[in-house]
């Protein structure tokens, strides 16, 4: 029993350091794993970033390809639509084919004759019925031209004098015009009115006459040509000129 216990104690004492060594080794291994894991993680991150950049570059490269494919597809659709709408119209000969389906051809003898004429004369006479030409159709007038012509026509109508006809009746009495009245003229007088002319001798004579009248007024205090036609009464005092004005009252010639 003692041996067993002793052995057990030895084993227990030896087991304790072994367990401590195991812990140390496991800790070292963990540290080693952590040390080795650092670069591996950075490498994995770098790989992921490289893959992301490659994917972005691939997307950017695919965008112009898609942009090029889109107009090409649109052009293909347009070409298909034009191909469906495109057609060649038939010629007059194809439309006006005879019942048997063969186009008209001159006989060989006529072709030979025409070639011989070309060889000898050089030209062929044109045998065709010349139809008369019709006059050109008048162009439709625009609204502006019509509006310009209308006022001109109205002005012409207004300018035309009214011509009297046998169907014109004047129901209202007309007042006689002065020109229609027979004026009595003195014998020897002309129908035309005399034109007044200004002469120097007449002007000078008028000035002398007015000067004499003014002297008469200043001397007598009375105007020869009074306003009222009646003569002056003997009881009325003579008019005297005031100092402010030469003429006491206006003369009437």
UniProtKB/Swiss-Prot annotation:
Biased composition (Polar residues): 238-247
GO terms under cellular component: histone methyltransferase complex; nucleoplasm; nucleus
Record-given protein name: PAXIP1-associated glutamate-rich protein 1A
Subcellular location: Nucleus
Organism whose genome encodes this protein: Mus musculus
Region (Sufficient for interaction with ESR1): 160-253
Location of the region described as Sufficient for interaction with NCOA1 in the Swiss-Prot/TrEMBL record: 115-159
Subunit structure: Component of the KMT2 family MLL2/MLL3 complex, at least composed of the histone methyltransferases KMT2D and/or KMT2C, the common subunits ASH2L, RBBP5, WDR5 and DPY30, and the complex type-specific subunits PAXIP1/PTIP, PAGR1, NCOA6 and KDM6A; PAXIP1 is required for the association with the MLL2/MLL3 complex. Forms a constitutive complex with PAXIP1/PTIP independently of the MLL2/MLL3 complex. Interacts with NCOA1, ESR1, NR3C1, AR.
Region named Disordered: 1-108, 126-253
Recorded superkingdom: Eukaryota
GO process terms (BP): chorion development; DNA damage response; DNA recombination; DNA repair; positive regulation of isotype switching to IgG isotypes; regulation of cell cycle G2/M phase transition
Biased composition (Acidic residues): 141-158
InterPro entries, per the entry: PA1
Modified residues (Phosphothreonine): 137
